[in-house]
A protein has these predicted regions:
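Intrinsically disordered, low-complexity regulatory regions
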Residues: 204, 224-227
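Positively charged, glycine-rich low-complexity segments
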Residues: 1-150, 156-201, 213, 217-221, ...
Length: 241
């Protein structure tokens, strides 16, 4: 409940920043978001579970984004268990980093990185090694430098033999070279890749959470506007794949 209270408090800040971007009808839903909560409980009332509430469902709402992330993380966990058991696959977690950019370049850079990602996953080596993936764009904000870092988190399904078969295995160094090549940015110094040995809650939450942290995008109106514009662009591009 403490986490919910914190998110609800941030919703008050969110209302001020989102107002210029939505119509009055949507704004009414945002103002009333989660003002009604219905719980189910056991006989002792010691264990309670949220049963129903009125949600605005805006992707930037701190409460709705938090609740959706928890739900999506559970969905990913169940999906992974099913694929491991029924398809006999394993998973790797890949993070593709990029240089920081200013607000005015964020939109164009995300569009370019989205294109680069699609290009990389059409490479013969990657097609042979991967059996499916889920990706998520995350944007973080550096307050001291006033710039943004867009990067991709990618959950990739691979054959069990991937880790021992040299024909298909892609090392961290090779992932880095591929990412540098498709982006054309030799300054990229690292990518992170690791085998998921079990359903790691931290990695699943990274995949499930929204593209930005509310602690970042609710700093001020300027930062919020940059996140809002750029994340809408990414959603549109991703839907076109």
């Amino acid at each position: 409940m403490e986490k919910y209270t914190e998110k609800k408090r941030r919703n008050q800040v969110f209302q001020k920043f989102i107002e210029r971007h939505v119509k009055e009808g949507q704004m009414d839903l945002i103002r009333e978001c989660n003002t009604f909560l219905s719980f189910v409980a056991d006989k002792t009332l010691e264990k309670q579970k949220l049963h129903k509430s009125n949600l605005c469902k805006n992707r930037f709402c701190p409460v709705c984004a938090w609740r959706k992330a928890r739900k999506d993380a559970l969905g990913l966990s169940l999906m992974m268990q099913y694929i491991k058991q029924k398809e006999d696959k394993q998973f790797i977690f890949l993070t593709l980093t990029t240089p920081n950019v200013t607000a005015e370049h964020l939109e164009s850079e995300i569009k370019a990185y989205n294109h680069s990602f699609q290009k990389m996953f059409k490479r013969k080596k990657v097609i042979s090694a991967t059996k499916g993936y889920v990706r998520k764009l995350e944007i973080t904000y550096n307050k001291e430098r006033d710039d943004y870092n867009p990067h991709f988190h990618v959950l990739i399904a691979v054959n069990k033999s991937y880790f021992t078969d040299k024909r298909y295995y892609i090392s961290q160094k090779e992932w880095l070279e591929l990412w540098r090549d498709v982006t054309g940015i030799s300054e990229i110094t690292q990518v992170q890749v690791q085998k998921i040995r079990q359903n790691n809650n931290k990695e699943l939450y990274e995949m499930a959470k929204y593209s930005g942290k509310d602690s970042d995008y609710l700093i001020n109106q300027k930062v919020f506007d940059a996140f809002y514009k750029s994340c809408l662009l990414y959603t549109s591009d991703a839907a076109d794949e």
